[in-house]
From Swiss-Prot:
Expressed by the skin glands. One of its GO terms (cellular component) is extracellular region. It comes from Odorrana grahami. Belongs to the frog skin active peptide (FSAP) family. Brevinin subfamily. Keywords: Antibiotic, Antimicrobial, Secreted. Antimicrobial peptide active against the Gram-positive bacterium S.aureus (MIC=12.5 uM) and against the Gram-negative bacteria E.coli (MIC=25 uM). GO terms for biological process: defense response to Gram-negative bacterium; defense response to Gram-positive bacterium; killing of cells of another organism. It is found in: Secreted. This is Brevinin-1GRa. Its main location: secreted.
């Protein structure tokens, strides 16, 4: 469960960071 969650976060967080900071 945790490795899956970590993988999901690693894929999801950069997209949020990109939207917030406008840096992609």
């Amino acid at each position: 469960f945790l490795p899956l969650l970590a993988g999901l976060a690693a894929n999801f967080l950069p997209k949020i960071f990109c939207k917030i900071t406008k840096k992609c």
